[in-house]
Every structure is written in structure tokens, then in C-alpha cells.
Amino acid sequence: MTFFTRCFRRGALLFLLAVLLLPSPAQAVRIKDIASFGGVRDNDLMGYGLVVGLGGTGDKKSSTFTISSMVNMLDKMGIAVDRTKLTPKNVAAVMVTTRMPVSARPGSRLDITVSSLGDATSLLGGVLLMTPMKGVDGKVYALAQGPLALGGFSAEGDAARAQKNITTVGRIPGGAVVERAVPFEFNTQNKLTLHMNVQDFSTTMQVVDRLNDNMGGQFASARDIATVDIMVPPAYRGNLVPLMASLENLPVTPDSPARVVVDEKTGTVVVGNSVRISKVAVSHGNLQIVVQENPQVSQPGAFSPGQTVVTPQTDIAAQEENRRLVMMEGATLQELVDGLNSIGATPRDLISILRTLKAAGALHAELEVI
């Protein structure tokens, strides 16, 4: 890599970081983007089943639970088999998962995900047999069945193998039919609960004020930092859909504490708009020490009584980049970026600088390393 290329990449990374950190007016979002109404949520369903029709890529005999499942299934159909003679190479035991919305009614269809449970190498071309889908209460809420759709393939021979994506997980769009609805009488509620995704008092109170302004009274109140209770106005009792539609689209401007998030594995740094730094002097330089061993070999002449002698020789070179001492007083993020650019800091250098600023008490933000 040439010097010009290194400089260009460093400049491009710092320019991108500067653009991301530019101060900008806070943007309004809808309430439904930062909160959810209590009770209006999906319910997870899970089931155990068999996928058949695999071309020799199914489970091996070591997957004893697959053989037991085959024996039980055939026994229910009135077919007696010797389990010692069953070879499940065309069958795979799978776990089937899906999420059922609270609004789902009998006859509704759900997309399902099918994942191999045993040692099958591929589910390509398989068909899921009828599988009961149960909730956490042990009741059956849906039945799943159908051919799998995979987003990859796998092929191998004696000396080579080709694979794209994962072939042991597949999906069946609309593969489950709802047989039982979740008991939930939506329109009979006289009180609603709003769960905030943003843990911030200012944002929660802003939501309360917006709700009360829209409903024309003190119907909403904050229970805690992340919960808002809403008393249903008399005009909407028994018909909550119009009320919910109007409330969830109200605009608010979320607030959040100053935070800097650092991903050391990738060198990614995300700085919030509220981050400030006190007046501080920053200098950042790299000290590079290279130790190289060059042993010297003394070889005597042929047929001489001398012995070969190896003399160790170590060369040590130290090189340190000269960086300027920069005084930064970060009233804004742009000043922080400009100051770091002036000392030639790369995004990975920024991680070390931010850690040091936090230790010195000059960074007024929460520093989170992931």
C-alpha cells in the first residue's frame, strides 16, 4: 500500500466520521417508533416435527431421536416397524418456530422457520410433515406443514465441496394455519399502558404532554421512567382503534443522555449529539520499536579442526511520530472532530483518545465499549 493510498484512506475515514458527528437539529419521530402498547404484541410458538423427502442429506443413525420419532409416527398410522432397520438418511428432525400476532384469528396463516435439530447436512427439497405449534402454556395454537424454501445450496464430491449460505435452516411462507386465537378483548379496555423503548424522563414526560394535548384532558400520566398509563376517554370506550391510530402517530423529539459507543473489534466510533468535552490539551503519537535478529555464522574451512560458531546480533530501531499538542475545548462535536483531525488521528486513534479523555474527566458523556 503506497503512502498516498494510506493518506487517502485515513482522510476518507475522518471525513466520514466528521459528517456523522455534525450537529443537527433533533428530529421528531412517531410515538409508535419509540414505544409499544401493552398487550399488543406477538406471541412465540414452537413445535417439533419431521422433514421428509431429503436426497440422502438427512440425519444419521446417531440421531436416535429421529428414529424414535419415525417409529412413533408410523405406529400411529398402524404400521409396525423394526427400529433397528430404519435408516433416516432422507428424514431430518427439526424445530419449527413462528410468531403469532395478537390479532391472528383461526384460519390466518403465519410464516414459519424450520431448523435442523440433528446432524442433517441439508434440508434442500424437504417437506415438513404436520407439526403442532404450541405456546408457553402448552396449548396448540397453529398447525404447520409444507415444502421448505432455502436461500442456499450445498454440493460435494470426493475431493471438493461447494456451499452457499446455510442449508440447514429454511422457511415456509404461510406454512402454519392458526387454529386457536389468543384471548384478548381489545375494545373492552378502559385503561391502556404505553411501554417506552427509550429510558429517559424527559422523553417520557414529552410523550405524556403530547397525549394529553391530543385527547384534550389529563388522561395520560407517567408511572415511571418507561411506563405511561392512559385512561380511555369516554368518547372512545368500546372503539379503541381510532384512538390508537391517532396516538401512535403523534410526533415527539426523543432526548437521550450523552453517550459515546466504541466497537474495538471494527474500530467503529459513534458519538451522540449531546457529547461535550472540557478544555484539555491532547497529544497523540505512535512509538514503533522494531527488534530484528541477524545471527552471524562463522564457518571454518573444509577439513580444518575448527567448529562452526553462531554469534547472535540484534538490531533495535525505534521510531516515534511527532504530533502537535492541541488545545481543545469542545463546545460542539465539530470542534472535537476538527481538533482530532489537526493531530492526524485515525478512527482507531480516536478510541484511545476518548478513553484518555474519559479518564481525565474531560469527556462529559458515558463511554460504552462493545
Curated annotation (Swiss-Prot):
GO process annotations (BP): bacterial-type flagellum-dependent cell motility
Source domain of life: Bacteria
Family matches, as InterPro entries: Flag_FlgI
Signal peptide range in chain numbering: 1-28
Signal as UniProt keyword: yes
Pfam families attached to this UniProt entry: FlgI
Annotated compartments: Periplasm; Bacterial flagellum basal body
GO molecular function: structural molecule activity
Protein's UniProt keywords contain Transferase: no
GO cellular component: bacterial-type flagellum basal body, distal rod, P ring; outer membrane-bounded periplasmic space
Swiss-Prot/TrEMBL keywords: Bacterial flagellum, Periplasm, Signal
Oligomer status and interactors: The basal body constitutes a major portion of the flagellar organelle and consists of four rings (L,P,S, and M) mounted on a central rod.
Function of the molecule: Assembles around the rod to form the L-ring and probably protects the motor/basal body from shearing forces during rotation.
Family listed: Belongs to the FlgI family.
Protein's name according to its UniProt entry: Flagellar P-ring protein
Protein species of origin: Oleidesulfovibrio alaskensis (strain ATCC BAA-1058 / DSM 17464 / G20)
Underlying gene: flgI
